[in-house]
Amino acid sequence: MAESEQKNEHSVGSEGASEAGDPSAQAKAAVDATTADAQAVDAGETTPAPADSAAEGTKREVEPVPVDEPQSFPVTVIIRRYDPEVDDEPRWVDYDVQMFSTERILDALHRIKWEQDPSLAFRRSCAHGVCGSDAMRINGKNRLACKALVKDFDVSKPIYVEAIKGLPLEKDLIVDMEPFFDSFREIQPFLQATGKPEKERHQTIAQRERFDDTTKCILCAACTTSCPVFWTDGQYFGPAAIVNAHRFIFDSRDEAAQVRLDILNDREGVWRCRTTFNCTDACPRGIQVTKAIAEVKQAMMTGVKL
């Protein structure tokens, strides 16, 4: 009897050992365990935990929170139109466009031109406030259309758009920029130094900072065409030309500072400035234009670079 029990125990132990080392037996046990868990869940006895490993699957993704879609709204844009082939004088034309708060006045002009009136004429290029080609007068203030956000205006009232003042009007929002660039070229806006250097011309941080502000000019003409002196006297050099002269007058590498000071020491030069700060307010690059003009005046009187 004892011998029989020992044989049975040996048999059971052998079967257990066989199952522990048998892969098919392990797989069967895993399936049985999964089935048991599923039955427990169906019976409401437990809640399954999310799988954490690659073998068991990935965690359940969290549903995204719904976001309200941005809503458009109507905006009335009134543009001062002028076609030299048809009009004797400029005229105001109303346009209603659907806009979003994050859009810009340039987007409104595009929408009008592409969807309502393809004859509308205006300049634009980069649309990122770098080229300076889309300067215009918006609600009585010179701005770049690509930087004027709709949300910054009271859209319960019309937005008025017209060409910048003081330069010859060609069509709609386009003016003749040649008088502006003539003044710019006259102040010799380029580095002038004698001889070829043996190595690059170095500057200290302080020397660079001396004229850093005026290097930001993008020649958009917003400052010059906001100047009341320029409106009444188109021969005045204007703020933009003086700003670009400042950029080289105070450059330690340049040797023609006095040449530019002599050019600006003219009845149409810096002394025509009346310090109204219109130019500083209009500059889309944040240049302290009035300050730069004052520094050129002081350099002209003292004969030295500040």
Enumerate the language-model features and the residues they cover:
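Ferredoxin-type iron-sulfur electron-transfer modules in oxidoreductases and energy-metabolism complexes
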Residues: 102-118, 157, 162-306
